[in-house]
Amino acid sequence: FSMCEHHMLPFWGKVHIAYIPKGKVLGLSKLARVAEMYARRLQVQERLTRQIASAIERSIQPLGVAVVVDCCHMCMVMRG
């Protein structure tokens, strides 16, 4: 989970990561570690998605990378 920087309430969900390797191949634990590293910060979902994709792009320079983040935000759930 992560914390919404606007409301200081948690949001949680799933992160889907896909990439086309160009030489280097990352293990599943490395992808999870990248997602967790950025999720620990005060975040908004859009920036979290961009940061994960950018980190993978910078570190292994794949032919392509896609990141989809699907979350439930408590700031929206509490409003009803």
From Swiss-Prot:
Keyword Nucleotide-binding: yes
EC class (word): hydrolase
Pfam families for this protein: GTP_cyclohydroI (PF01227)
Binding site for Zn(2+): C4, H7, C75
Disulphide bond pairs: none
GO biological process: tetrahydrobiopterin biosynthetic process; tetrahydrofolate biosynthetic process
E.C. code: 3.5.4.16
Subunit structure: Toroid-shaped homodecamer, composed of two pentamers of five dimers.
Family recorded in the similarity comment: Belongs to the GTP cyclohydrolase I family.
Name the record gives this protein: GTP cyclohydrolase 1
Organism of derivation: Euglena gracilis
